[in-house]
């Protein structure tokens, strides 16, 4: 990767991290989209996205906990199954065409998610057995693709009225953090490599994550940004579809 390409990559990662952190996400699906558009090899994408995810999700978790929005009782039913499933799936090696199709599907889901408005509603009790099943399924996808799973958990919690949008974001951040660490642990068991540009991308992700997390806590209109992000994700998904 040339110096100019690295500058472009880091800049885009920073912007993506800010956008995702503003809704309590780590941004792995966005990082995968950026790497796809810049032609990063599939072998590098999964570990790179997970590492960036850990950094941004950690910042978002700290911000939401300090702001008092985090609720442990909404998190643990998903975690008890998602962490082991993410670890096992992370250790599983899949062929490149299958990997690309899984990422394309994930990006499409993420894009659709960006166009769904967030509304407060009457909150229902969280059914623990169902949450455990959902957590396991999200964990498998997280480990296989290289995401934290928040892009799936957040809309589900809101649509099922298990949490307000802000509570869902506050729960998704640590969920993403721990799932990403589990996925990385699984990958580590089979070995992976990272490129030098990842350290610059990590710095960009940290800066973007700080900006986005602060913006989320202080609130602000995110609708047009979310829709623009949805379009970017759809473009990246299309690229994965035609190259798989």
Residue ranges: model-predicted function:
Residues 42-47, 169, 173:
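Small-residue hotspots at the loop-to-helix junctions and early N-terminal turns
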Residues 49-53, 172-176, 198-202:
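Short hydrophobic/aromatic, small-residue-rich stretches within specific transmembrane helices
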């Amino acid at each position: 990767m040339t110096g100019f390409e690295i500058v472009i990559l880091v800049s885009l990662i920073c912007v993506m991290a800010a956008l995702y952190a503003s809704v309590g996400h780590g941004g792995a699906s966005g990082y995968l989209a950026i790497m796809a558009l810049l032609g990063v090899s599939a072998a590098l994408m999964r570990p790179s996205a997970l590492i960036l995810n850990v950094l941004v999700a950690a910042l978002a978790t700290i911000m939401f906990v300090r702001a008092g929005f985090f609720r442990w009782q909404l998190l643990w039913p998903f975690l008890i199954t998602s962490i082991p499933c993410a670890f096992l799936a992370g250790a599983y090696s899949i062929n490149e065409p299958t990997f690309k199709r899984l990422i394309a599907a994930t990006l499409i889901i993420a894009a659709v998610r960006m166009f769904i408005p967030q509304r407060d509603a009457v909150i229902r009790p969280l059914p623990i057995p169902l949450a455990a099943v959902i957590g396991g399924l999200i964990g498998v996808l997280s480990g296989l693709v290289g995401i934290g799973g928040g892009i799936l958990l957040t809309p589900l919690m809101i649509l099922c009225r298990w949490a307000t949008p802000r509570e869902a974001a506050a729960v998704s951040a640590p969920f993403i953090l721990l799932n990403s660490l589990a996925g990385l642990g699984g990958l580590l068991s089979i070995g992976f490599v990272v490129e030098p540009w990842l350290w610059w991308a990590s710095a960009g992700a940290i800066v973007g994550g700080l900006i986005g997390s602060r913006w989320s806590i202080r609130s602000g209109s995110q609708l047009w940004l979310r829709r623009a992000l949805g379009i970017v994700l759809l473009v990246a998904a299309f690229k994965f579809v035609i190259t798989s």
